[in-house]
Amino acid sequence: VPLTFFPKKVPGLQQAFRLKDGAWRMNLTVEALGQSVQADVFHLYSLKAGAAYGSVLMNFFVVGAPANEWRISVPAGIGNIDVSGQNVGRDWRREGDVVVVPLSRPVLGAGTILLTFEQPMCARGGDISPGEVRPLGVQGERGYVQVVSPLQVNYDISRSEGALLKLDPSELPAEFRLLSSAPTLAA
């Protein structure tokens, strides 16, 4: 029986069966599934004189077993880090190239955090590698990268690897385009 047709709502109901007569029997094999975490990530980089300012919004979806912490890869050249979000206190820490974010309550289902940072750059320009701030220990990651600047700058995408697709700025979802009023350089 489809769960939507079950006459009484029961929290946590996963299977329902209908009996056609009194002589019935069933064997059920049950297997506990491990934790699976999917991440939707939006990287926003704003280029200004002497620095690139980054905001990385991470939406996690956890099934199987609750998550007690988030682990995020952050390159060494990135500083002035701040982390905020659901169930996130001030006790996050940096361990080398990893930011460890303990959660005040374990998360099962959806969880969101925002990691902001600065990456120093020469006032005349320099190199940045958007997308290097990434969630660790996830089974799947997808998302968007947007680079904006209120300044007039020349830029060149010197290298693009993997499953990264260049987008026209109008192809970014509207909810992400609204996060910056500066012109988009690359998406």
Q: Predicted regions: what is each one?
A:
Residues V1-A187:
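Extended non-catalytic domains of envelope/secretory-pathway proteins
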